[in-house]
A protein has these predicted regions:
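A substrate-engagement module of RecA-like helicase motors
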Residues: 1-14, 65-142
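Conserved pre-motif I regulatory segment
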Residues: 1-42
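Aromatic side chains
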Residues: 18, 53-55, 106
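Conserved structured core elements
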Residues: 21, 25, 47-53, 69, ...
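Residue-level recognition of well-ordered secondary-structure positions
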Residues: 25, 57-60, 101
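Walker A/P-loop NTP-binding motif
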Residues: 32-33, 52-65, 82-86
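Walker A/P-loop
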Residues: 36-55
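Short, surface-exposed connector motifs at secondary-structure boundaries
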Residues: 37-41, 62-67
């Protein structure tokens, strides 16, 4: 795993401009050990350390379920849409990944149905919107 962070490692070979950093390698070792032992880990590292790759690479190499929690949706989107595909491709990762968000980010079908049933009490524009939303909710899978 730490070879991934070497000058000629998988990350350097696959990611243009990648430069190995000792603090990044040390963090990757700590993350690997925590995953192997099934122990929690809290890491504090400065800007530019390479924290994202330092936890993503060991998580992908672990062949175990790993949860990565972010402090904001923006960081979650960056991680899932940019960093994860980059590291996955570099490490030739073929496993599954999933993006999970809190329930406040999803439509509650039960509440939508309640609003649709209470249609007589709603202004016309809102009722129209509820009907469109209800139709849309039957077409989506996520």
């Amino acid at each position: 795993m730490t070879d991934d962070f070497a000058q000629d490692g998988q990350l350097a070979k696959a990611i243009p401009g990648f430069k190995p950093r000792e603090p990044q390698r040390q963090m990757a070792v700590a993350v690997t050990q925590a995953i192997e032992k099934g122990q929690p880990l809290v890491v504090e590292a400065g800007t530019g350390t390479g924290k994202t790759y330092a936890y993503l690479a060991p998580a992908l190499r672990a062949k175990k379920k790993v949860i990565i929690s972010t402090g904001s949706k923006a960081l979650q989107d960056q991680l899932y849409s940019r960093d994860l595909p980059t590291v996955s491709k570099a490490l030739k990762y073929t496993g599954n990944v999933a993006l999970l968000k809190g329930r406040s980010n999803y439509l509650c079908l039960e509440r939508l149905e309640q609003q649709a049933l209470a249609g007589g009490d709603l202004p016309v524009q809102i009722l129209s919107d509820v009907i469109l939303l209800r139709s849309w909710s039957n077409q989506t899978v996520d």
